Swiss-Prot record:
GO terms for cellular component: mitochondrial nucleoid; protein-containing complex. GO terms for biological process: mitochondrial transcription; positive regulation of DNA-templated transcription; regulation of transcription by RNA polymerase II; transcription initiation at mitochondrial promoter. InterPro entries: HMG_box_dom (IPR009071), HMG_box_dom_sf (IPR036910), HMGB (IPR050342). It is found in: Mitochondrion; Mitochondrion matrix, Mitochondrion nucleoid. It holds the Pfam family HMG_box_2. The gene is TFAM. Binds to the mitochondrial light strand promoter and functions in mitochondrial transcription regulation. Component of the mitochondrial transcription initiation complex, composed at least of TFB2M, TFAM and POLRMT that is required for basal transcription of mitochondrial DNA. In this complex, TFAM recruits POLRMT to a specific promoter whereas TFB2M induces structural changes in POLRMT to enable promoter opening and trapping of the DNA non-template strand. Required for accurate and efficient promoter recognition by the mitochondrial RNA polymerase. The lineage of its organism: Eukaryota, Metazoa, Chordata, Craniata, Vertebrata. The record marks 58, 182 as: Intercalates between bases and promotes DNA bending. It comes from Sus scrofa (Pig). It comes from the Eukaryota. Binds DNA via its HMG boxes. When bound to the mitochondrial light strand promoter, bends DNA into a U-turn shape, each HMG box bending the DNA by 90 degrees. One of its GO terms (molecular function) is DNA binding, bending. This is Transcription factor A, mitochondrial. The keyword Magnesium does not apply.
Length: 246
């Protein structure tokens, strides 16, 4: 199971979909939500749901990001987000209010539209499809969250030694079906000596340090722009402790 999770992570990082077969198990790699069955009529109803409005800061970031990218074409997204966050902090309250008012107005329209669509469903339909509704919402919420975090420049999670090895060898492998490549690479990993594996173990440790430092900096930025909801519990506890000591 751990191997499947590892391969799924690598395929995702390489832009592969769940349609790629796992060389080890020979079955399709499924998304955690792929088991959910949603009737066609209900899918069409949910697809008509409006998107949640962007928060004031996200709206501001989305407007500014293309401008900053044009001015700094070689800069990383995380660097640009940091500059945008600084610009947002310095923005006068009167200008911030424009974005906040726009968010409140969009939220009101969003609620009204959702209520209108929900009223079209009969009570029996709502009861019988309660689980499917929840799964659909969770999937959509996870996708929105992922896109938002990407736009906000959240650092990528550290990779394991095995994932680093696969990513490296996958790009070097000859053209062919993904499942064949993965099977070959997996066998190569098993045949590595302890000293050879140690190289990738060290790279994984270095990646953990990179992730820790980038996350610390990123979470500090999120606190500054009022996105405490994105902060890990350990970070919140540490910040609270520092405040009490002061």
């Amino acid at each position: 199971m751990a191997l499947l999770r590892g391969v799924w992570g690598v395929l995702s990082a390489l832009g592969k979909s769940g349609a790629d077969l796992c060389a080890v198990c020979g079955s399709r790699l499924r998304s955690p939500f792929s088991f959910a069955y949603v009737p066609r009529w209900f899918s069409s109803t949910l697809s008509g749901f409006p998107k949640k409005p962007m928060t004031s800061y996200v709206r501001f970031s989305k407007e500014q990001l293309p401008i900053f990218k044009a001015q700094n074409p070689d800069a990383k997204n995380s660097e640009l987000i940091k500059k945008i966050a600084e610009l947002w902090r310095e923005l006068p309250d009167s200008e911030k209010k424009i974005y906040e008012d726009a968010y409140r107005a969009d939220w009101q329209v969003y609620k009204e539209e959702v209520n209108r669509i929900q009223e079209q469903l009969t009570p029996s339909q709502m009861v019988s499809l309660e689980k499917e509704i929840m799964q659909k919402r969770l999937k959509k919420k996870a996708l929105i969250k992922k896109r938002e975090l990407t736009m906000l420049g959240k650092p990528k999670r550290p990779r394991s030694a095995y994932n680093i090895f696969i990513a490296e060898r996958f790009q070097e492998a000859k053209d062919g079906p993904s499942q064949v490549k993965l099977k070959t690479i997996n066998e190569n990993w098993k045949n590595l000596s302890s000293s050879q594996k140690q190289v990738y173990i060290q790279l994984a440790e270095d990646d953990k340090v990179r992730y820790y430092n980038e996350m610390k900096s990123w979470e500090e930025q999120m606190v500054e722009v009022g996105r405490n909801d994105l902060i890990r519990r350990s970070m919140k506890h540490s910040a609270k402790k520092d405040t009490e000591e002061c």
